[in-house]
């Protein structure tokens, strides 16, 4: 990430930034980000729309929906650990600190917008409550319906459809409402103690075969590339541990 000084100088001088995470990226021609997920899932036994709750220890393994597993990689929300592992008394001392972890939600609004040449538009402004437009229609022509250009407009708060429609009238590129979704857990908010808490949780869980992975499991502000990198690193660790065990 650029420094504060670099941000100010680049904005004053209208200098393009080429090193930031969104300066260049690959995007699927069809299917969007779901295409990547489906591709990675090929050849794997994935059970969709299943709740992995009430995971219990049995015979030195973990019982998940009637099947026994040596290890569990938990990619959910760390605030739900107690629900997923109800018999782990070792977790109870952590519950007060886990409950204090802060987070932020987002209302995402699917819209039609005027054609433009942008991918992301960051637009903090006192005149409206949105902070950015993600021009998904410009990532691939297949994201659009004919000549209609689509975008996702984000608001950092929960909003009603009526509030959204009024806000869209104030936003550039003439957005037209199509649908919206409120996600309570979008961004983990870290403080000086959150990483210490997650480290201590890992030290407690990993000897028992439970591993935390992902944005809300590790309470880290992972972008997708960083999340995938963390998954690959954990996979290497687990493979090495398996070889050590023989």
Place the predicted regions along the sequence by residue:
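Alpha-helix boundary/capping residues
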Residues: 11, 15, 88-89, 171, ...
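Short alpha-helical patches at coil-to-helix transitions and adjacent helical residues
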Residues: 33, 37, 224, 228-232
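Hydrophobic, Leu/Ile/Phe/Ala-enriched alpha-helical segments that form helix-helix packing faces
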Residues: 40, 44, 164-172, 242
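General beta-strand structural signal in soluble alpha/beta enzymes
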Residues: 48, 212-213
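C-terminal segments that line or cap access tunnels to active or ligand-binding sites in enzymes
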Residues: 70-71, 80-211, 217-225, 229
């Amino acid at each position: 990430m650029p420094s504060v000084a670099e941000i100010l100088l680049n904005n004053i001088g209208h200098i393009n930034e080429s090193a930031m995470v969104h300066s260049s990226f690959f995007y699927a021609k069809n299917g969007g980000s779901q295409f990547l997920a489906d591709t990675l899932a090929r050849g794997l036994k994935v059970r969709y729309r299943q709740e992995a709750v009430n995971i219990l220890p049995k015979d030195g393994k973990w019982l998940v929906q009637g099947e026994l597993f040596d290890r569990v990689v938990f990619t959910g929300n760390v605030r739900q650990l107690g629900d997923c592992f109800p018999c782990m008394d070792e977790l109870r001392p952590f519950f007060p600190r886990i409950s204090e972890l802060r987070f932020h939600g987002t209302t995402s609004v699917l819209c039609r917008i005027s054609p433009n040449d942008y991918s992301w538009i960051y637009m903090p402004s006192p005149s409206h409550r949105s902070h950015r437009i993600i021009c998904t229609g410009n990532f691939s022509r297949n994201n659009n319906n004919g000549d209609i250009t689509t975008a996702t407009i984000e608001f950092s708060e929960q909003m009603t459809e009526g509030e959204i429609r009024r806000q869209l009238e104030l936003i550039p590129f003439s957005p037209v409402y199509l649908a919206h979704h409120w996600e309570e857990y979008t961004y983990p908010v870290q403080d000086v103690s959150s990483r210490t808490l997650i480290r201590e949780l890992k030290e407690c869980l990993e000897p028992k075969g439970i591993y935390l992975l992902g944005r809300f499991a590790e309470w880290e502000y992972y972008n997708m590339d960083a999340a995938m990198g963390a998954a690959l690193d954990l996979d290497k660790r687990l493979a090495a541990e398996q070889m050590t065990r023989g």
